[in-house]
């Protein structure tokens, strides 16, 4: 009984106490007490394993709670960016109506500026945050593949990135980002960054004679799915302008303007370029959150599977521990009964 009290009061020294207690017992008691000592030793080990499993289960539950929070945030962001995309399309319609008025009297044979040399400026939209699956890898591979198909030599490519996470994937493809912009999700920050990007594109055109500007970004399809997309920003599409010129005005009132045609045209084109950049970023952000939502759904499923495994292990081990305790009680009862006899 003295040996048992020592064992129960200090589980960390279970084996040591049991061993020396066993050596100090009379030879006649060895066989009987050895069984009890082994029982207490294994019970102590079982308790340690149970505590470890319980900590693992608690950690998995905390991780599951975090994943659920991120899923909720991603869903809210997808909805918000979707509403912004709808508003931007209305804004684009207003720009088109303005251009429609300006280009009505421009002759169809009017010349459009053509690229002076085979140089390309690429704007690649990535993410600032992680945990969004293969979002950045997909757009990086898509951009490089399309630039190769355009047959633009690597030395004639100038790449600008939005989002730090995509840079490493571009470098893995053997390219370098000369211009890098970081951005935040709030509206004022996005507007400021887009103005800086537009200014940099104008510098490309004026100083480096880069007249071909292409945007690469992921755009949402439905739910948590998206696809990579390429938009040729410059030079402006001649057929698009001719289509606007031939388009029938919806209202009976004939529109007009008072300011200089060239100034108005330049202002509208700048608004169109800004809109295209802004829309690309918003659709990229919506796609990023769609990718993050899909990643969190997979993570939640994996966590739930892991939790089920841990719970089964915990319950089985707990049942084994209870069985051992019951067996010890039965053994003790039998020993006392035999002693009385």
Model-predicted segments: where are they?
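Extreme N-terminal basic, low-complexity initiation segments
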Residues: 1-15
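C-terminal beta-strand-loop-alpha-helix "lid" module of Rossmann-like NAD(P)-dependent dehydrogenases
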Residues: 36-341
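Short hydrophobic alpha-helical segments enriched in small aliphatic residues
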Residues: 11, 21, 29-31, 37
């Amino acid at each position: 009984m003295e040996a048992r009290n020592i064992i129960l009061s200090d589980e960390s020294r279970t084996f040591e106490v049991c061993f020396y207690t066993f050596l100090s017992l009379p030879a006649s008691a060895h066989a009987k007490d050895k069984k009890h000592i082994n029982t207490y030793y294994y019970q102590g080990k079982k308790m340690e394993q149970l505590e470890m499993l319980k900590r693992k289960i608690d950690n998995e539950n905390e991780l599951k709670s975090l994943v659920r929070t991120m899923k909720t945030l991603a869903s809210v962001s997808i909805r918000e960016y979707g509403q912004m995309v709808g508003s931007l399309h209305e804004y684009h319609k207003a720009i088109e109506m303005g251009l429609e008025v300006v280009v009505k009297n421009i002759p169809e044979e009017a010349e459009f500026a053509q690229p002076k040399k085979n140089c390309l400026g690429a704007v690649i939209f990535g993410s600032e945050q992680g945990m969004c699956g293969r979002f950045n890898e997909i757009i990086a591979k898509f951009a490089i593949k399309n630039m190769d198909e355009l047959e633009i030599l690597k030395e004639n490519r100038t790449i600008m990135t939005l989002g730090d996470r995509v840079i490493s994937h571009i470098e893995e493809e053997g390219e370098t980002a000369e211009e890098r912009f970081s951005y935040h999700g709030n509206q004022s920050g996005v507007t400021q960054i887009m103005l800086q990007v537009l200014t940099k594109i104008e510098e490309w055109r004026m100083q480096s004679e880069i007249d071909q500007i292409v945007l690469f970004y992921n755009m949402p399809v439905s739910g948590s799915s998206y696809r990579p997309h390429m938009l040729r920003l410059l030079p402006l599409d001649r057929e698009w302008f001719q289509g606007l010129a031939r388009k029938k005005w919806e209202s009976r009132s004939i529109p007009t303007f008072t300011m200089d045609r060239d100034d108005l045209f330049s202002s509208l084109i700048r608004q169109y370029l800004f809109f295209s950049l802004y829309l690309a970023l918003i659709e990229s952000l919506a796609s990023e959150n769609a990718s993050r939502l899909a990643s969190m759904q997979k993570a939640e499923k994996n966590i739930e599977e892991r939790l089920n495994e841990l719970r089964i292990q915990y319950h089985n081990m707990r049942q084994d521990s209870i069985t051992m305790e019951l067996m010890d009680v039965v053994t003790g009862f039998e020993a006392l009964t035999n002693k009385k006899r």
